[in-house]
From Swiss-Prot:
Coiled coil: none annotated. Residues 1-18 form the signal peptide. Expressed by the venom gland. This is U7-theraphotoxin-Hs1a. Residues 19-51 form a propeptide. Contains 4 disulfide bonds. It comes from the Eukaryota. One of its GO terms (cellular component) is extracellular region. Its main location: secreted. The keyword Transmembrane does not apply. The keyword RNA-binding does not apply. Belongs to the neurotoxin 25 family. F7 subfamily. It is found in: Secreted.
């Protein structure tokens, strides 16, 4: 019992010494710097994002925002080992599975946050 208490106490002392805390000025600087970085990244992402749909089903695309339609997504198909992306709505030949797939596509489009 005493040995386990000594081991725990020693571990805590080592942890306190090994991980010194930052002073408040350094912490404030880190927060400001990280907020500026996040704001820059968000602005860049918003600028690079397509604003409206421009492709119909069957046409080549690079992301979901380019495809027109609530259930149309930019899907990947591999032909001879090469990835080809095109706008697609149909997910299955089975009618029931196709409806479920289109619902999943609609959720995926909503998550894409296209303007």
């Amino acid at each position: 019992m005493k040995l386990s208490l000594i081991i725990i106490a020693t571990s805590l002392v080592i942890a306190v010494v090994a991980f010194p805390s930052k002073d408040s000025a350094a912490t404030d600087f880190d927060k400001t710097e990280s907020l500026e970085n996040v704001e820059e990244r968000v602005e860049t992402a918003l600028d690079e994002r397509p604003r409206a749909c421009s492709k119909n089903p069957g046409e080549s695309c690079t992301n979901n925002c380019e495809c027109c339609g609530a259930t149309v997504v930019c899907a990947s198909v591999y032909v001879a080992g090469v990835e080809k992306k095109s706008c697609k709505s149909k997910t299955s030949d089975n009618g029931f599975l196709n409806i479920i797939g289109q619902a999943a596509n609609a959720v995926q489009n909503a998550a894409s946050l296209c303007v």
